Structures are given as C-alpha cells and as structure tokens.
Design a protein with these regions (language model features):
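Charged DNA-binding/catalytic regions of mobile-element recombinases
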Residues: 1-157
Length: 157
C-alpha cells in the first residue's frame, strides 16, 4: 500500500486528495478529499482503508515524510491495525514512485486543461475519475484489465 497527498488549484481554492494505492493491482482502495491538508483528512482516508481491510491483513503502508505521516495519532492508528509503516528517504520522491505516477496520470487525464465551475463540480469529477480508474480504465501492466477486474481475476485463479 502507498499514500501521499496532492493539491489541485480550483476556482481560487485548493483541494487536497489523500488516496491509498494498492501496489498489487494499482487500485485506489480508499481516499479522502479536503479543502485543507490536515490530520483529519488522513484519518478519514485511514477509516476507509480499515473498513475494507481483512482482519488478518498485515500490510506495509508506504508514504513520504510529510508531517501527517510522522504524527503520533497516524502512527498509533497504523499500529492498532497491524500495519507496518514505511517512509521514503528524505527528499526522494522516487521512493514513492507508484503514488507519484498515479497523481501524474490523474492530473493529465482529468485535470489539466479542464475548467470547473465550482469546487463541488471538481470534487464530483474527481470521484467519477477514481471510479473510472478502478473499474473501467485498463492497464497493460494488469494484462489489459482494470484494477478491480485484475483483483477479481486473481482471487478466482
């Protein structure tokens, strides 16, 4: 698993996305959207992750060294759910390359060059894109399947 936070400038405001990327199939398994990059946003993202995570799971969860991921509350929540924290080396964005790749693809495919009337319109478009990305957008790395199709196919095999 990997996470990070990215910023969008929309209608003279800023919108922040905090997703969880499953490195097995590149599925976004939880995310939160906020108008400020605060600890509550990260806790909301974690709540979504915990709700979907099997009790027996013991994942490694990678992030950069952002202040949210160094916060004692964040680290406590991970430990309570048997998640091992992993952090990038200082100043090395390539350590979290899968997450950076997702953000780049997201911005090229649904943000750059687009005009949104309101922040709410943008958030709706972001929700729709994440659904599309997980369920419809195919990837050659996933044998021509979407992330959800690949996960489902792998479980059936």
């Amino acid at each position: 698993l990997a996470t990070d936070i990215t910023e969008f400038k929309v209608c003279n405001d800023k919108v922040y996305l905090s997703p969880v990327l499953d490195l097995f199939n590149r599925e976004i398994i939880s995310y939160s959207i906020s108008l400020s990059p605060n600890l509550q946003q990260v806790k909301d993202m974690l709540s979504g992750l915990f709700a979907k995570m099997p009790d027996t799971a013991r994942p490694v969860f990678h992030s950069d060294q952002g202040w949210q991921y160094q916060h004692a509350e964040y680290q406590r929540l991970l430990a309570e759910h048997n998640i091992t924290q992993s952090m990038s080396r200082k100043g090395n964005c390539m350590d979290n390359g899968a997450m950076e790749n997702f953000f780049g693809r997201l911005k090229v495919e649904m943000f750059y060059g687009e005009q949104f009337e309101t922040v709410e319109d943008f958030i709706h478009a972001l929700d729709e894109y994440i659904y599309y990305y997980n369920n419809e957008r195919i990837s050659l790395k996933l044998k021509g399947m979407s992330p959800v199709q690949y996960r489902t196919h792998s479980k059936a095999s």
